Every structure is written in structure tokens, then in C-alpha cells.
Amino acid sequence: MKTKQILLLGICAMLLCPTIEAAERWLEGYKKVLVIGAHPDDPETMCGGTMIKLRQMGVEVVSVYLTGGEAGIPGKSHEESRIIRTAEAKKACEAMGVRSIFLTQIDGNTEINKARYAELEALIEAEKPDLVITHWPIDSHRDHRVCSILVYDAWRQSRYSFDLYYGEVMTGMQTQTFAPTHWVNITEQHEQKVKAYYCHKSQDMPLVQEWHDAMEILRGMECHTKYAEAFTKQVWTE
């Protein structure tokens, strides 16, 4: 979707969306947040501004990576790519002031099975977050879908012990049919977010920035600010 089309959608949505003061009230009260992404750079691009804002609010934030980005650098072996991409992710986390954790799945070959559920559930039990943010489940990238399913099922298995929200990554190309329920003003955090995800030097970050800047302008228009990130809350169900 082109930038002009995104801006037009934002203009149409402005009258229906909340003010930023109302939109951000949902962040209040959290003490520990996990952002669980499929690959190095997913948490940073999905909600790096919100992660930075939470840290500024005194909240503990942990960036969790399902894989090490093993398939993410053409011409490199899985092991070479993993070493490079995890190092980049650690630098990005340092730039945001958050802690990083890497799980053991393989980029491009993620699995849903008992062992993978156990790995994620053990992490959540050890960290005890009160908020988890992960991928929206409708996505063109299989690893993103796998990550979302694992987190959703872990949430149900925990008997809803934490709030679960979904974020978006390159909406229209990867995230599909995303309908936000909550927004965060990241105008003051935008520059720091961009610097953080540019730590991923092995990736095409100018393309990512072009895409996410347009998304953040759209989400900002929806809640009457310059840049924003958007989320959808998972409602409790039996």
C-alpha cells in the first residue's frame, strides 16, 4: 500500500478514534512486559517505540526472539546468520534499554509441538509478565503465525495470567487485516526506535523504515498525534 493511500485511510479514521490521552491509558499499571517476536528485528519494528516508552515509565521490558534469524542473510550459513543477527538484536535491545532472550527455534522452520510449548511456557513462568505483546496471527510469514499461536496457547494455558496484545509488522505485506483497539503515541520515541532497529545492519532497514514510518503516521492520525503504534487486545474466552 502506497504512502498516500495510507494517509487517506488515516484521515478517514480520525473522527472515529480516541484522543491519545485516552488511547494510552491502557499502559498504566504494568510492571513487566514481554515482547515476543519470531525473528531478530520483529519486536523492535513492531513496537520499539512502546518498549522505549515503557522503560521511560519504569517498566521492566524483555524482548524475546523465537529464532536466531538463521535464514535471514543470503549467502550465509544458518550458524553464521545466527551469530550476526543475534548480535545485532542485542545491540538494538541495548539501544532501547531492554533485556533480550533468545529461544531455540530455527528461522524458516519453526514448529508447534509439545516441546516448543514447554519451552515458551517455562519462559513465561520464569519471567511472570503482566503484559505480553506478540504478532497478529493473520500474517503472510509462517514464522509470525507460529509465534502468535504459541503465545496465544501459552496465555490460555496460564489461565489468562497476563494481558495479551498483538502488534503489526509491515502491514499489508506481512500483517494482514489488522484492526487496532489500542494506540500508543511514540512521537517522542520515534527517533530512538529508528536508531535501535538500524542496529540490524544485515537487513534492508531503509525499506523497513519507509514501510513502518507510513504505518506510524497512519496510526498517529488515528489517535491525533504525529507517530503512533497500534495494538489489538486479545479478549478473554473460555
PLM regions with names:
Residues 21-36, 76, 94, 99, ...:
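Metal-dependent de-N-acetylase/amidase catalytic core
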Residues 1-8:
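Bacterial N-terminal signal peptides that target proteins for export
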Residues 70-98:
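Glycine-rich phosphate-binding loop and adjoining beta1-alpha1-beta2 segment
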Residues 66, 93-106:
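A conserved beta-strand->alpha-helix junction
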